[in-house]
Amino acid sequence: ETVDMLIHCAGINGTIRDIRDGYDYPGMLRTLNVNALGAIRVTEAFLPLMDRGTDKKICCISSEAGSIGTCWREDETEYCMSKAALNAGMAVLSNRLKKDGYEIRLYHPGWMNTYMMGTKEDADLNPEEAARLALQSFFKIREQEKLVLDSYDGSIIPW
């Protein structure tokens, strides 16, 4: 009947890390397709149900990797590009949908104890703790007018 909150949490990372190793361009397009365009497509599909909802929150698991302002990485180009594209796309949707009562949230969960990024023993958080912190962020009362990228540690990441 209705959907009040949509959480985009799908994400993949590519296998080629360094430009000197030769990029896998079809793989890069796949990463962009899943990480950025996937959220746009799912949002579009759910809008009729969300229009009838009350909270109208669209929440995205993003990453500090999508921050141009704080970029420190030397590799993982496709992942970084895909998260920057997700953030930019959601900024446009936020501008468009705000007048219809929607709120969009971007969230960086930190390095989670999963196999997505390799050696999971060194990660900051386990998936359960990361999910708890994400939900806290999504339900937190927000006073900012602009869309921001919240981090698991309570900071706001410039992007």
Question: Could you say what each language-model-derived stretch is?
Answer:
Residues 3-7, 11:
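Conserved hydrophobic beta-strands of the Rossmann-like cofactor-binding core
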Residues 106-114, 118-159:
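C-terminal helical subdomain
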Residues 43, 82, 114:
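Ser/Thr-centric signal marking residues that sit
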Residues 43, 90, 131:
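Short-chain dehydrogenase/reductase
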Residues 8-9, 57-63, 103-108:
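Structural signature of the Rossmann-like NAD(P)-dependent dehydrogenase/reductase core
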Residues 2-3, 28:
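Local beta-strand N-terminus motif with an aromatic residue
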Residues 12-32, 40, 51-98:
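Catalytic loop of short-chain dehydrogenase/reductase
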